[in-house]
């Protein structure tokens, strides 16, 4: 991991298209601004983890009856 010290309004450039700006620094919080092309997803890691957990939970809760009914439709029953 690369660790860089920055002050408010200083920037970090990643490649040609991504720029990170330090917007503010408080006691336990740093606010950053990210300029990147719209086709590059920018997500907080805790949201990715939450979505992953919800998807796993939903997959476990699939009703077997529903799956059988879908299977019957494709079989022509």
From Swiss-Prot:
Keywords carried by this UniProt record: Bacterial flagellum biogenesis, Cytoplasm, Repressor, RNA-binding, Translation regulation
Keyword Lyase appears in the UniProt entry: no
SS bond partners: none
Gene3D superfamilies for the chain: Translational regulator CsrA
Primary site of residence: cytoplasm
Ranges in coiled-coil conformation: none
Subcellular location: Cytoplasm
Molecular-function annotations in GO: mRNA 5'-UTR binding
Pfam families xrefs: CsrA
GO cellular component, one term: cytosol
Protein role: A translational regulator that binds mRNA to regulate translation initiation and/or mRNA stability. Usually binds in the 5'-UTR at or near the Shine-Dalgarno sequence preventing ribosome-binding, thus repressing translation. Its main target seems to be the major flagellin gene, while its function is anatagonized by FliW.
Family membership noted in the UniProt record: Belongs to the CsrA/RsmA family.
Subunit annotation: Homodimer; the beta-strands of each monomer intercalate to form a hydrophobic core, while the alpha-helices form wings that extend away from the core.
Protein name according to UniProt: Translational regulator CsrA
Species name: Nautilia profundicola (strain ATCC BAA-1463 / DSM 18972 / AmH)
């Amino acid at each position: 991991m690369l660790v860089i010290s920055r002050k408010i309004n200083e920037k970090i450039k990643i490649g040609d298209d991504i720029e990170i700006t330090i917007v503010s620094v408080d006691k336990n919080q740093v606010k950053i601004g990210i300029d990147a092309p719209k086709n590059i997803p920018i997500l907080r890691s805790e949201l990715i983890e939450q979505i992953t957990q919800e998807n796993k939970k939903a997959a476990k809760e699939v009703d077997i009856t529903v799956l059988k009914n879908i299977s019957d439709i494709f079989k022509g029953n």
